[in-house]
Swiss-Prot record:
Protein name, entry field: Phosphate import ATP-binding protein PstB
Annotated positions binding ATP: G61, P62, S63, G64, C65, G66, K67, S68
EC number(s) per entry: 7.3.2.1
Higher taxonomy: Bacteria, Pseudomonadati, Pseudomonadota, Gammaproteobacteria, Alteromonadales
Keywords recorded for this protein, A-Z: ATP-binding, Cell inner membrane, Cell membrane, Membrane, Nucleotide-binding, Phosphate transport, Translocase, Transport
Cell location: Cell inner membrane
Length: 275
C-alpha cells in the first residue's frame, strides 16, 4: 500500500471492469496501436486501451507526456495541426474515426470537448447553449427553450442564470462560464465528453462544483478527463491511465492504480518522486 497516494473516492470503485476484455455493450471507444507524429517527432507510441461507457476515465502524467495529445485524437482536433500524422485506429461503434469516409463535423458533435479555459461565445447565455442546435437547423422555440433548461440543469447552472438567460455570457464568473461551456457541449447530446484540464484556471470552490458535476454527467455520458491534479483524478474517475513520454504505462481502475500500481514508473509518479 502506498500511503502518500491520493485518496480515492470510494463511490467510484463499486464496479470494477476488466478493461482488456470489455463487451461491445460496455465499450465506448477502442484505441488500437495509436502512434502520433508532429513532423519527425513521435508524441504517442503504440497506445492501446478500451474506454468504458458511462464512466469517467482520467489521463494523468507529467507535462508533455502526451495525455492532452491523446485526448485531442478522440475527436480529431489534431487534424488542425498541419505537421501532425496519425497511425493506428480509434474505434467508435466499431468504425475507425480516422477513416476517410468519416464526417469530422458529425464526429465532433458526437464527441464534445471542453478546454482548459472557459471559452463562451460573445453571445447571450441562451444563445451559447443553443448554438450547436441552430447550426443543425433547429428553429422551434419551444424545443430550444427545453434544451436550454435541460442543458443548464445538467451543468448545474440553471438556478444561477434562469432569470438572466439573455444577458452576456461574459458577465458570468469563470466557474459559471466553464459550466456554461459544458452545457453548450451537452446540448447537442454527445455520447462522449472530453474535458482537457477543465478546472486548471478555476478557484478551489469552482473546481469542487465542476468535480461534483463530472460525477453527475457520467449517468448520461462517457467522460474522459485530462488532469495534472492526481487528487482530482482520484476523486472523480473510475479508471485512470498513466502516461509517460508518449507511452501508456499503466491503465486500471482508479483504486488499483493509486494504491497498488503494477509499474515502478507509476508508483514513482503518484508518490511524487518525479513529475
Amino acid at each position: 500500500m502506498i500511503s502518500v497516494a491520493p485518496k480515492v473516492n470510494q463511490a467510484n470503485t463499486s464496479l470494477k471492469l476488466d478493461l482488456d476484455n470489455l463487451t461491445t455493450e460496455q465499450t465506448a471507444l477502442e484505441i488500437k496501436d495509436l502512434d502520433l507524429y508532429y513532423g519527425d517527432k513521435q508524441a504517442l507510441s503504440k497506445v492501446n486501451m478500451n474506454i468504458p461507457k458511462g464512466q469517467v476515465t482520467a489521463f494523468i502524467g507529467p507535462s508533455g507526456c502526451g495525455k492532452s495529445t491523446l485526448l485531442r485524437c478522440i475527436n480529431r482536433m489534431n487534424d488542425l495541426v498541419d505537421i501532425c500524422r496519425i497511425e493506428g485506429e480509434i474505434l467508435l461503434h466499431g468504425q475507425n474515426i480516422y477513416d476517410k469516409s468519416v464526417d469530422v463535423a458529425a464526429l465532433r458533435r458526437n464527441v464534445g470537448m471542453v478546454f482548459q479555459r472557459p471559452n463562451p461565445f460573445p453571445k447571450s447565455i441562451y444563445e451559447n447553449v443553443v448554438y450547436g442546435l441552430r447550426l443543425q437547423g433547429i428553429k422551434d422555440k419551444r424545443k430550444l427553450d427545453e434544451v436550454v433548461e435541460q442543458s443548464l440543469r445538467g451543468a448545474a447552472l440553471w438556478d444561477e442564470v434562469k432569470d438572466r438567460l439573455h444577458d452576456s455570457a461574459f458577465g458570468l464568473s469563470g466557474g459559471q462560464q466553464q459550466r456554461l461551456v459544458i452545457a453548450r457541449s451537452i446540448a447537442i447530446s454527445p455520447e462522449v465528453l472530453l474535458l482537457d484540464e477543465p478546472t486548471s484556471a478555476l478557484d478551489p470552490i469552482s473546481t469542487l462544483v465542476i468535480e461534483e458535476l463530472i460525477n453527475d454527467l457520467k449517468s448520461k455520458f462517457t467522460v474522459v478527463i485530462v488532469t495534472h491534479n492526481m487528487q482530482q483524478a482520484a476523486r472523480v474517475s473510475d479508471q485512470t491511465a498513466f502516461m509517460y513520454m508518449g507511452e501508456l504505462i499503466e491503465y486500471s481502475d482508479t483504486n488499483t492504480l493509486f494504491t497498488t500500481p503494477n509499474k515502478k514508473k507509476t508508483e514513482d509518479y503518484i508518490t511524487g518522486r518525479y513529475g
